[in-house]
A protein has these predicted regions:
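Active-site and donor-binding regions of nucleotide-sugar-utilizing enzymes
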Residues: 1-69
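Donor nucleotide-activated moiety binding/catalytic core segment of transferases
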Residues: 5-8, 148-191
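Short, acidic/turn-prone active-site loops that include or flank metal/cofactor-
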Residues: 6, 39-45, 64-65, 163-169, ...
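A nucleotide-sugar donor-handling region in carbohydrate enzymes
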Residues: 54-114
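Conserved catalytic-core segment of nucleotide-activated headgroup transferases in glycan assembly
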Residues: 89-148
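Conserved donor-binding/catalytic loop of nucleotide-activated donor transferases
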Residues: 176-178, 194-198, 220
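Nucleotide-sugar donor-binding patch of glycosyltransferase catalytic domains
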Residues: 199-262
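C-terminal amphipathic helix plus adjacent low-complexity
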Residues: 235-307
Length: 307
């Protein structure tokens, strides 16, 4: 197995598998004799899978908490529902190494541009005032993960020593040692934390897909922060384009410059004090997993039948 960009020029692989990047599948389908698309966002109401996708199979994650609308897979060649992909072993590893009491994951922040720089700064201001400062005042061991360059530039300087840089494996290792992971509502991180057995708390969403993810999991009992209580819950139920949803959410984020509390101190405290869900409850949300094995089996069967 090699990354597409690392293959010798002019080579065609027996198969190309693109994971969580169905848009790029249209570009790389010519890189291999066969193309398999693994998607985690087929459930999004506003984002049916891209038209013009020619693939040997479209494997979409369908989790109990996020069922996929039938219209989102209509017209896609060979759609196959699979369980959650990837993540660590279901049980957290036993380790004597000390980790941080709290891991704060700020992945998903968009790189600042003239249009959104102040939105990013306002969002991080909310997190700093309501979560990071109180944790630090209590002396809680804390790590902040995400785009380290962006965070170093946009977070207040007093948090510079808490920012961690590393790859996904290093982030997962940090989470495995933490008592609680407080994270942006990204699906991959939520799934991995629930598989691992982490206690988890959800930060307020930054975009429409995060809002929809957050609403589903908050309704199921995971603790988290909503923008100004329930006032955005209606938006999660609307069938609208992502850019319009982002524009609405950005207005709520910018309003925090006047009213930065967003939620009660008790609600923020709930993130820090979150308890891990039982395996039974986690399975009711994300299923038993095994999506990566389903992908491997499909490739094995396809190539066995054709040989």
């Amino acid at each position: 197995f090699v990354q597409v960009g690392e293959a010798p020029s002019g080579t065609r692989a027996d198969a190309v598998v693109t994971v969580m990047n169905s848009k790029r599948a249209i570009e790389i389908v010519e890189c291999g004799e066969r193309c398999y698309v693994v998607d985690s966002l087929a459930w999004l109401w506003d984002a049916p899978s891209p038209g013009g996708l020619v693939a040997d199979a479209y494997l979409y994650q369908e989790l109990p908490a996020l069922p996929v609308p039938e219209r989102n897979i209509q017209g896609i060649p060979r759609p196959i529902a699979i369980g959650a992909v990837g993540g660590p072993d279901p049980q957290r590893p036993v380790t004597d190494e000390a980790g941080s009491d709290i891991v704060v994951n700020l992945a998903g922040l968009r790189a600042p541009s003239p249009d959104n720089k102040e939105v990013v700064r306002a969002y991080l201001g909310v997190i700093a005032q309501n979560l990071l400062d109180p944790c630090r005042a209590e002396g809680r061991p804390l790590q902040i993960w995400g785009n380290a360059t962006l965070l170093a530039d946009m977070l207040p300087e007093r948090f510079a020593d808490l920012i961690e840089a590393g790859d996904q494996e290093q982030f997962s290792e940090a989470c495995s040692k933490a008592r609680v992971v407080i994270t942006s509502p990204g699906l991959t991180t939520i799934v991995e934390c629930l598989q691992r057995g982490n206690a988890i708390g959800l930060l307020p969403p930054q975009n429409l897909s995060q809002l929809r993810i957050s609403e589903r999991f908050l309704a199921a009992g995971i603790v988290g922060i909503r923008w100004n209580g329930d006032s955005l819950s209606w938006l999660a139920r609307q069938d609208m384009p992502e850019p319009l949803g982002v524009e609405i959410i950005n207005k709520y984020i910018m309003a925090t410059r006047e009213h930065p509390s967003v939620a009660t101190p008790a609600a923020w405290r709930g993130l820090v004090d979150a308890q891990a869900l039982s395996r039974h409850v986690a399975d009711k949300l994300i299923g038993p997993g095994g999506g990566e094995r389903a992908v491997a089996r499909l490739l094995h069967d396809d190539f066995t039948q054709s040989s």
